[in-house]
Curated annotation (Swiss-Prot):
High-level lineage: Eukaryota, Fungi, Dikarya, Ascomycota, Pezizomycotina
Protein name: Mitochondrial division protein 1
GO CC term, one of those recorded: mitochondrial outer membrane
Protein's job: Involved in mitochondrial fission. Acts as an adapter protein required to form mitochondrial fission complexes. Formation of these complexes is required to promote constriction and fission of the mitochondrial compartment at a late step in mitochondrial division.
Stretches with biased composition (Basic and acidic residues): 1-10
Segments forming a coiled coil: 210-250
Biological source species: Aspergillus niger (strain ATCC MYA-4892 / CBS 513.88 / FGSC A1513)
Gene that produces this protein: mdv1
Classification via CDD domains: Mdv1_N (cd22881), WD40 (cd00200)
Disordered: annotated segments: 1-23, 140-174, 242-268, 398-420
Length: 657
């Protein structure tokens, strides 16, 4: 009895069990388990219950509360239930033995493995980095319990206000803040290291991108050469097939009768004789070889400019020796037509930046032009409009000068002489000339089989390109007089200002189906109906001559010498948006994303329609004012983000936009 009584009075409850049927023997008795359970229950109640002094045992309450939350998870409960089915003997046997523990404690890694550890330039250990990250995690957890923390801070504030803080508490708080400052320094250095790594990766990616762009440019050059060779081979095959077909056709039978019989036949039947003589004469005259029209097929579209940054220069070409008056191209890296005051019209291959020929025929400088599907229309100061078909090109090398004045400078002659060996004159491209205006042609536009031309004779003419004749003449002055007489709300009312004498009377035109938009020197934009020949609507807003315009399905954009660009809503006839520059607008064009304009500066003015951002593009960007300045931009053209500009010194450059 004394022996059992001493076991009950043992403070540990299990430490005094020495029977062979104890924990290491056959098992634990129910009495020992009940005693252990009572002690655990009392200990847990003491730890988790409310304490009279909040300064002692607070971390125990927090720890047990966390354990209680973890025990509520279903996975944890299943593990506990499975643990109760295991006997204490199995639990003890599942532990590591003393030998295994000693072996793991004294084991060490060989020097070969330690030598392969990479060197690290960081002065902070992995554990310090973990501590810094752990502090961030604890900070986020504290924010989740913001309400409870705020209440605790209020209680601490009340306590501190009531009782002065002890020096030991202040020292602990100082040490805590110093530790946090040290961890903040570690985290800052870690962030700086990550930023440097990211910068290095970005630089490497930029270098890789440049290498791939160069490779893409080379592939497109090879592709263009292969396409050119393929077109030449196909043309040769077509020529050989035509020659074979001509050789298979039998020659016409020659008459065997004598000349006397022929004379008698002619005298007997005059009509028959005339026909016979006509045939015989024309058979003896060598007829020119007919040129078969060949369409220039584009098998692939260039994509290099799509990967350049906006504002990057693609090519710069010394195109002319005088100011560029008109430029246009069909598609990016395709065919470009340029005209200037040096009385030349040049055809360019934008893929290689080379002049491939000239369009000769005008007696004066070309003021306006357009290219569409190998068809080129040019309007000149000689009051004529000429049509050209580039698919009928037959190139022969010759001098590139069209008309040269005697007072030309020697530098211009040297430039032409240097380009003569590399340029060719396009023959057989001329189709016909449209001659009806009595003054210079200042604007033109064609769509389908309809061409509209505007002239300084103050008229607009509609041409049928199939028949090659004028089908309608629109008198702009008569339309303006009629509008001022009617005085309706949507028509023009005289403002008392006179048109600028230096400006073109018809500054810009564009047609689509039966709709025609025309901008004139009086600042008016008139919308015509070609079916009736009447002005459908007049847009009032500009205070200077209209120099350029373009419209799509919804909006019409106009540029004027009053330094403003206005965007009109075609559905209502009102102004949708407007902005201005420092100098007059000489040229303008837009695509789906941007509006580009030449505004009397050495840069192209770009306006993003999506976000309303204005920026400059061209050779004048970033140029020091004290150094040499690029020439003023006179003409701009934009298609699919591919920008071409023509300058006052005759240089033409291509940019990404």
């Amino acid at each position: 009895m004394d022996k059992h009584r001493r076991r009950d009075e043992s403070p540990s409850g299990l430490s005094d069990i020495v029977e062979p049927d104890g924990l290491l023997g056959t098992g634990i008795t129910s009495r020992h388990i009940e005693a252990f359970g009572r002690k655990v229950t009392s200990t847990a109640g003491h730890l988790m219950g409310p304490a009279p002094d909040s300064s002692t045992g607070g971390h125990y309450h927090t720890a047990m509360a966390d354990i209680q939350r973890e025990l509520r998870h279903p996975n944890t409960q299943r593990k506990v239930f499975s643990l109760t089915q295991t006997t204490p003997t199995d639990l003890v046997r599942s532990k590591l033995s003393t030998t295994e523990i000693q072996s793991r404690a004294i084991s060490s890694l060989p020097d070969e493995l330690l030598a392969n550890i990479p060197d690290d330039s960081s002065s902070y250990s992995l554990f310090q980095g973990f501590q810094a990250s752990q502090d961030d995690i604890e900070y986020r957890r504290a924010h989740r319990r913001r309400s409870s923390k705020s209440k605790k801070l209020l209680k601490d504030g009340e306590t501190r206000g009531a009782l002065p803080s002890a020096p030991s508490d202040l020292k602990k708080e100082r040490d805590l803040l110093s530790r946090r400052m040290e961890l903040m320094g570690v985290r800052k250095n870690m962030c700086s290291s990550e930023i440097h790594d990211i910068d290095n990766k970005i630089a490497n990616l930029h270098n890789m991108r440049k290498i791939v762009l160069d490779r893409l440019a080379g592939l497109e050059m090879e592709e263009a050469d292969l396409e050119h060779e393929l077109n030449e081979i196909e043309n040769k095959l077509e020529d050989i097939q035509e020659e074979q077909q001509e050789a298979e056709v039998p020659p016409p039978a020659t008459p065997k009768s004598s000349e006397a019989n022929d004379d008698s036949i002619v005298s007997e039947d005059p009509a028959m004789g005339a026909s016979f003589m006509s045939e015989s004469i024309y058979q003896k005259i060598p007829s020119p070889k007919s040129v078969k029209q060949r369409s220039i097929r584009k098998r692939s579209m260039p994509v290099l400019h799509e990967h350049f940054a906006p504002g990057s220069e693609i090519k710069e070409m010394p195109a002319h020796s005088d100011m560029v008056t008109a430029i246009d191209f069909d598609y990016p890296f395709g065919t470009m037509i340029s005209a200037a005051l040096d009385d030349t019209v040049r055809v360019w291959d934008l893929n290689v930046g080379r002049c491939v020929g000239f369009l000769e025929g005008h007696n004066a400088s070309v003021r306006c032009l357009q290219i569409e599907d190998n068809i080129v229309a040019t309007g000149s100061m000689d009051a004529s409009v000429k049509l050209w078909d580039l698919s009928r090109a037959r190139t022969t090398t010759r001098d590139n000068r069209v008309t040269r004045r005697e007072d030309d400078e020697e530098s211009a002659q040297a430039d032409d002489a240097s380009m003569a060996s590399h340029s060719t004159t396009l023959e057989d491209c001329y189709v016909y000339s449209l001659d009806a205006h009595v003054d210079e042609v200042t604007a033109l536009h064609f769509k389908g089989d309809t061409l509209i031309s505007g002239s300084a004779d103050k008229t607009l003419r509609q041409w049928d390109l199939v028949k090659g004749r004028c089908v309608q003449t629109l008198d702009v002055l008569w339309a303006a007089a009629q509008a001022s007489t009617l005085g309706s709300e949507t028509t023009w009312r005289p403002s008392g200002r006179l048109p600028d004498a230096s400006a073109d009377f018809v500054g810009a035109v564009q047609c689509f189906d039966a709709a025609l938009a025309c901008g004139t020197a009086d600042g008016m934009v008139r919308l015509w109906d070609l079916r009736s020949g009447q002005v459908h609507r007049s847009l009032v807003g500009h205070t200077g001559p209209i120099t350029c315009l373009q419209f799509d399905d919804v909006h019409l954009v106009t540029g004027s010498q009053d330094r403003s660009i206005r965007i009109w809503d075609l559905r209502t006839g009102s102004i949708f948006d407007a902005y201005a520059y420092d100098k007059p607008i000489t040229s303008m064009m837009f695509d789906t994303k941007r509006i580009v304009a030449a505004a009397g500066e050495n840069v192209v003015k770009v306006y993003d329609k999506a976000d309303g951002h204005h920026w400059d593009c061209g050779a004048g960007v970033g140029v020091d004012d004290s150094g040499p300045q690029p020439a003023t931009v006179e003409r701009v053209r934009l298609k699919d983000g591919f920008l071409v500009e023509g300058r006052k010194d005759g240089i033409v450059a291509a940019w990404t936009c």
